[in-house]
Amino acid sequence: MNKENLTAYEVVTEENLTDIHSTGWLLRHKKTGARVMLIENDDENKVFNIAFRTPPKDSTGVAHILEHSVLCGSREFPLKDPFVELVKGSLNTFLNAMTYPDKTCYPVASCNDKDFQNLMHVYLDAVFYPNIYKREEIFRQEGWNYHLEQKEGPLKYNGVVYNEMKGAFSSPDEVLEREIMNHLFPDTTYGCESGGDPKNIPDLTYENFLNFHRTYYHPSNSYIYLYGNMDMEEKLAFLDEHYLSHFDYLDVDSVIQEQKAFGACRDVTLEYPVAENEGEEDNTYLSYNMVVGNAADSQMAMAFEVLDYALLSAPGAPLKQALLDVKAGKDVYGSYDDGILQPYFTVIAKGSNPDRKEEFVSVIRQVLGDIVKNGIDRKAVEAGINYFEFRYREADFSSYPKGLMYSLDILGDWLYEKGNPFAQVQQLTVFEKLKKAVNEGYFEELIRKYLLENPHGCIMTLVPKKGLAAQREKELEEKLEAYRSSLSEEQLDAMVEKTKALEAYQEAGEDPKALECIPMLKRSDIKREAAKIINEELTVDDSLFLYHDVCTNGIGYVDLMFKTDSIAPEQIPYLGLLKSVLGYVDTENYTYGELFNEINANTGGINCGVEVFDRADSTEEFQAMFSVRGKALYTKMDFLFKMIGEILNSSKLEDTKRLYEIVASVKSRAQVNLTGAGHSTAVLRAAAYSSPMAAFQDEMAGIGYYQFIEKLEKDFEQRKEETVEELCKLMKKILRPENFMISYTGERESLETVQKLAGAVKAGLGTEPVEKSEEKLTCTKKNEGFKTSGQVQYVAQTGNFKKKGLEYTGALEILKVILSYDYLWMNLRVKGGAYGCMSGFKRNGESYLVSYRDPHLKRTLDVYKGIPDYIRNFQTDEREMTKYIIGTISGKDVPRTPQMKGSVSKTAYFCGVTEEMLQKERDQILNASAEDIHALAEIIEAVLAADQICVVGSESKVAEASDVLMEVKPLINC
């Protein structure tokens, strides 16, 4: 890039970013003062992000509602929902927007130059010239509205963000996290809920909503980021000529103010709702929260990440273990939150009681005091440093673009204009400094200053209360009814008309001319060749060695797998438990704490899991593998396999005290996952009514598993010996040479070494005779409704079309896009107010429809029933069909990290998917027409005919739906 050509910009700084093999530029737009960062490199996955400082002054969620709303049409793209059109018709590798406590971000990414330019154009127009000033309906749809269908009917609140936040506030873990921040920074913007508190969202007026945009969405308050291999001069010229130069400088008062330190640590007690069947005992959250430094100190930030690891995250970590030993809670964990101006460190005991608070605080201070006096465990700190350095060097963010993650990290410094904004991508020097500081008392001093002698903190107690959800629901109904009753006939008529007007706006189709404004690619811009499967079938001592020859920059990815088809149905939940036990208990040569630290000090980690593969050609067959996954530099491969062997061959399961700690922690975290990902929970359970594979997964990781672990935790004292015995039997049954196979991703230079090491592991496996079970799980349709203390629903319906003699086709991938962003989006999200709606179709015929954070239940099931007619009447032109095809391919052509390439190829192997199948399906997608979509109506009818329904939702909504559900029961019983 030639600096002489940047006439509209002033170059603030230029840096050689050696850690990420890039050149960094910091610019300032001369006319507006807009801040611009460029990171130039050879990464084809290009990223654009424009962010604004958006500090809220209340908890009405204005920043969040605006984030949704600006993407609902703009000056150059006057559609109702250009965001959806982009999702449907671009080759994006990322497309979203995010609201944080003090900023709002609009990032996009694509590997296609033309597509990237289109995405950038639409997003810039959206943030600077949104249609929110022309259509109040946008605010009412995305934020909140009074919903009154007839004068005598019930008055309700609706709105996408309103329902999203009802779901967020249904999780006590999320409530605790939000309240900690609010109470640590009560006099700043962090004392407000940027996402919106459902009880405050209806206080937001349309005018205040518009004023927020006028105030903060200006180039002078913007942070613009470009990353990757592109013509930076061209992009900067576009930015200036089309947008920035059309504005004058504005002095925007958006500086984030620091909270003045407290004179003394504060004590806060709050309540949260639990369902009627849930116990209040052992359900309290205790938290110890301290403000630590500021966002500009990148070394301190990484040091506190390491302290979180050394004190709380690692098994046997001293603070965690001390709190568990005194039974301060059934699960103990911590976090370091640094995405705001003043980061904070938190210690949480979950599954506690209010009367344990004093001991909770006392133990924390005693343990930390002892560490300051006697020194921190050097090995634990060194392991923590290596843990974070390995991940920093690896830079594997799965399907998320690397440049996107760098952008979000950089904003953590850049937004506050303190320190070097490039510091987050120049961390290697920080790791070197921390390694030296281990022996210099640095970590002990941080503990003393910030965690022990710091008055700026709070002790928060979150106490469960039965009936609180029903009480709040009743109060809201009474409030709305009182308001409805206060209105005159004319006002009621006007409200009904306004409800109808919003529905009319939502039901109106897009203007064809407006649709043509959205730039899009052609089918010819899409590569026709399907991705290659990188599998070489080798052997090690007659066992399968599946090799994936991928450039991994010196890191080897190992997956040792053991077939589990010999286990009995009643052993499946123990398999789910075993993956949480191995690696977290003592072995012959290490305590569990030493084991964890040794592994993390020398490798990228080892973890156990269960991988389940469905056969593409069968509705019944599947393969479940117990897996031990690890990654390390090639030079550390021998150590990695040594530790894997240690875990597999010498783990000690008889320590029932440790076993109980694991069971209690698993239960605690499973509760969060069940409700936090309620859509996945409901889909898996509904599929389990007829699918052997789904039934297996449910017993091993779903509701069935949670019911097992819940009872086990409750009755552990009586069942501890039995549990040890079952786990030992299970290990003997599956960790055997005849069950062994391995998948390895790495460069060929490392292959021979890994084969030898794998052979040694196999040779050490047990061979004593065991009894193999031929019994299989049975599936039973139950159509369950699971009651929670939450305020929203997750409504799933599943079925298998192959069981009706129908075949899979690539066109189903297009149907998924059509349903998720047309029919379901319009009927469940736009009209119904649900935050999300999804569908999916697998090669073995398993299919699902599901809603996410949905205020409805029966209405949603009725929407599902309408899908076949919608498909039969589906009308589209060539341009729209091409858009759906591009959107479908976008989801399939996501750039893959080296680890992902190996994992995807391994999955294809065990699922029986060939390159020929992938190419055939891709051709079916690229050549699809409206007629191909019409033919899929029969498939949806087959899915719906299975009548498999599962709902996770509020007590009241689930109870009301007893006529469409066969069983209604609580999700959580204790």
Question: Where do the language-model regions lie?
Answer:
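Generic recognition of flexible, low-complexity loop/linker segments
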Residues: 94, 210-214, 273-276, 319, ...
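M16 family metallopeptidases and their MPP-like homologs
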Residues: 45-55, 81-129, 136-147, 174-199, ...
